[in-house]
């Protein structure tokens, strides 16, 4: 039995398909979804979504958002979604270093600090993908 997955951004449905197991980055850590999962609503963080179908593994880098889980599906509403295959590790490393340098000179609780922290989180997710 499979789990139907939808990853939706403000611009479009970035991915739709079925898998045996989906893992998503929750606020309290990664959570997995198998068929017959309990109904759940969760806040998600920037990170890596992993979809497993048999021996095939597909990964996406996603921004923060929400997950709605049902017995046979998961819908992720996120602000961005990129295929892990499209990630340029050198660019992600540069973005992470720039974000960390910027964080040293700003109030991390300010709006600017939170924006920079989000950039750092996305760069880290790209490097993990």
Report each predicted region and the residues it spans.
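Acidic/glycine-rich phosphate/pyrophosphate-binding loops and surrounding catalytic core
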Residues: 81-129
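N-terminal export/targeting signal detector
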Residues: 1-4
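Compact, glycine-rich, soluble single-domain proteins
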Residues: 6-97
């Amino acid at each position: 039995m499979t789990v139907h997955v939808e990853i939706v951004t403000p611009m479009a449905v970035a991915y739709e398909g079925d898998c045996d197991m989906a893992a998503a980055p929750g606020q309290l850590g990664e959570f997995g979804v198998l068929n017959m999962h309990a109904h759940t609503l969760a806040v998600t963080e920037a990170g890596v979504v992993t979809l497993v179908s048999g021996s095939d593994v597909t990964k996406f880098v996603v921004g923060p958002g929400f997950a709605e889980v049902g017995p046979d599906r998961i819908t992720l509403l996120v602000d961005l979604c990129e295929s892990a295959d499209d990630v340029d590790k050198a660019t992600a490393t540069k973005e992470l270093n720039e974000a960390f340098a910027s964080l040293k000179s700003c109030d991390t609780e300010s709006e600017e600090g939170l924006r920079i922290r989000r950039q750092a989180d996305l760069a880290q997710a790209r490097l993990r993908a």
